[in-house]
C-alpha cells in the first residue's frame, strides 16, 4: 500500500495531518510489524479465496455434468446449502487465521497492478476442482465403491465433504509447493 507514515512523538503536526499512519511509539520496528501483518492478512485472504472458489468450481461441475449426462442431481438443495454454510465456514475461517509465515518479509512486495488471483492460483483452483469432480463423477456414474442404491446419496455426499476437507489442507500453501505434495 502507498501510505505516508509520521512519527507520533517527534513528528510535527503538519506531517501527522498529512500522513495516513501515525506511529505512537516512534519505533521503526513497528513499521516492520505492520508490513508483516499486512502481508500475512493478504496471504490468508488468498488462501480463503482459493478454498472457496475450488469448492464452488467442483460443486458446479458436479451438478452440471450430472444434469448433462442425464443422471439425477447428486445433491439436494438442503445438502448444497449445508456444504456452502456449514462445511465451508470452519475450514475457510481457519485458512483466514493461518499463522504468518516466517519468510514473509524476505519475499518481494506485491506489485500494485498484481491480481489477487494469480495465474498459478487459478490453475490450482481449476485443477483441484476438476480432480475432485472427476473422482466424484466416477463414483456417481460407475459406483466403484459398491454402494447400494439406498446408500449412494450418502456415499456421494460424504465423499464430496471429505474431498473438501482435503482441499482445505491443500489450500494452506499458495504458490511455493507443488500440488498434492
Show which residues each predicted segment covers.
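Acidic, divalent-metal-coordinating active-site segment for phosphoryl/phosphodiester hydrolysis
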Residues: 1
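Membrane-embedded transport module
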Residues: 8-178
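Mid-to-C-terminal catalytic subdomains of enzymes
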Residues: 181
Amino acid at each position: 500500500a502507498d501510505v505516508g507514515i509520521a512519527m507520533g512523538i517527534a513528528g510535527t503536526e503538519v506531517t501527522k495531518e498529512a500522513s495516513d499512519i501515525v506511529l505512537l511509539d516512534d519505533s521503526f520496528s513497528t513499521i516492520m510489524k505492520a508490513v508483516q501483518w499486512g502481508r500475512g492478512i493478504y496471504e490468508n485472504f488468498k488462501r480463503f479465496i482459493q478454498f472457496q472458489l475450488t469448492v464452488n468450481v467442483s460443486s458446479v461441475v458436479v451438478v452440471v455434468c450430472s444434469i448433462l449426462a442425464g443422471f439425477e442431481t447428486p445433491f439436494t438443495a438442503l445438502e448444497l446449502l449445508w456444504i456452502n454454510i456449514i462445511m465451508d465456514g470452519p475450514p475457510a475461517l481457519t485458512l483466514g487465521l493461518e499463522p504468518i509465515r516466517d519468510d514473509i518479509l524476505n519475499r518481494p512486495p506485491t506489485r500494485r497492478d498484481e491480481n489477487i488471483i494469480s495465474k498459478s492460483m487459478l490453475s490450482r483452483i481449476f485443477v483441484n476442482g476438476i480432480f475432485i469432480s472427476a473422482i466424484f463423477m466416477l463414483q456417481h456414474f460407475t459406483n466403484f465403491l459398491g454402494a447400494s442404491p439406498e446408500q449412494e446419496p450418502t456415499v456421494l455426499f460424504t465423499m464430496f465433504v471429505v474431498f473438501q476437507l482435503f482441499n482445505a489442507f491443500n489450500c494452506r500453501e499458495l504458490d511455493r509447493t507443488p500440488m498434492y505434495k
